[in-house]
């Protein structure tokens, strides 16, 4: 009767040495270089075994924000998303499908405008990511401001650490 049918990756790996019970994995990336590269490695491993991947990148500080430990300004989210894009294209899912990655960012993030340009066909290719899917979390407050032609303020997450959890 097909009352339940698992996702394609689950079916693909059933009965193999690498079975998966989930076809998609969602993670949150923190504002820490070691964690960023751990997430890139995790994405590659999950993709290798047919998992689709989604990453929330909202916690990364915005472009120009100070990285106090080395006293330099951050280059923001976009260069890391370029790496995510490249990992996605290099790893094919079990040799059968290309990698699939979605990246998420809040509408108040300082880098949201550059983020929205990631998939454009024009501009600096070092700031483009054509092979990942972008998603933007849009709160009701944003839409209310749009309706009223109101102001919207952008922040770097290191300046408002609790905003993402509201």
Question: What is the meaning of each model-derived region?
Answer:
Residues 1-166:
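Extended catalytic cores of very large enzyme megasubunits
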